[in-house]
Amino acid sequence: MIAGIIAVAFEKPTTKDFVWPCWGPSIHVGGISFCMNFVFFLLLLAMGIYIALFYLAFRRPKTIPGRLQALMEMGLEFVREQIVMQMIGPEGMPFFALLSAFFFFIFFANILEVLPGVNLALTSRIAFPIVLAIVSWVTYNAVGIRRHGFTGYMKLVLFPPGAPIILYFLLSPIEFFTTILVRPVTLSVRLFANLVAGHFLLAVFFLGSIALLSSAVTFVFGLVSGAMAVVMVGFEIFVSLLQAFIFSVLSASYIAGAMASEH
């Protein structure tokens, strides 16, 4: 009975549901169209939230901070102590701005998922996590090359200190693929997959609640589904914060590894 009601209420998605049309004229470069659409609007929205909060918090900083300034200072202190100092140490302070930007911007991009009227995390579009992962990848490799030189950095990557020489034929390819190829993939896919999964769960519970509440027979189940949807909203806020933290911590650990004399 319940399955039948849900099946009747369910409208099968089409490919059009995954394509956002342009809101105005587009620019074509090499067969690729660039235009303002819903996803680009989300990027501007996340950037706007990021800039506005920091501007409002620190435009007139006070010795005794107000609520917003205290909240943002608490967030920056968290990044400095729990990410920069824990993963890299005092030498990591030049990367404090980058890691803070990762943490806050990813969180604001993630939290759009539970914002009424938006309900789509910017990071649930794979292109955005890929760009962030590339920035992280370029940063830690540039740090390693600058610290050790290209040859010295490649030596540290390909020949881990302390390993028996006979194992290098096995370890060197693994280290190369892990450091140079796998890390940006895992960084981007981890962030993307977690936010997509959360989006699907929210959609299932909210749409299931609407479908079940439409019938007296399944009304109680609709209430349960609606309650679970509310719980999932809170859980997704936690996941949004957690994924921002994980991305920033991993980026910091990669930078620390590139700076170290030994892996």
PLM region spans:
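Selective transmembrane helix interface/packing segments
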Residues: 1-263
